[in-house]
Amino acid sequence: MAKTALQFRHNGRDVAVFVDGGVNLLTTLRDLVGDMTPKFGCGQGGCGACTVLIDGDAHLACLTLAESVEGRSVETLDGLKDGPNLHPLQRAFMEHFAAQCGYCTPGMLMAAKALLDHNPQPSREEVVNAIAGNICRCTGYEPIINAVLAAASGGRARA
């Protein structure tokens, strides 16, 4: 099968790769771009471990055809930090013990970032809905929800 040239922005920098037709974005990011932060969980869109932002909206990279991001912007956990400084969501996840094994964390953070970028002051229910497509077997979700709410309020605890 012939390869297709693909150009997109990845965490703020231009990327050009050649992909096989039908390959998903997760495989492209991990195998061709070298970004290992989106995780392979189920490969069927059921766990959220591969959540990335495409033009600011949360998408499951395992269900997204690589060719569909031509000319678009893709952001992963690697793009969240600003040099040595953690993103407020990353800091809040640490402060609220929102990660245990950490496998779901990249997808949770990206889903939460999409929410806060579109709605800087979400309600608890809006946070729950935003992360509903992301499975976490360790935390019971409360620390994650609390971390997102804290990040939204500038680090101050919210009820």
Report the location of each language-model feature:
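Signature of N-terminal electron-transfer/Fe-S-associated modules in redox systems
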Residues: 1-159
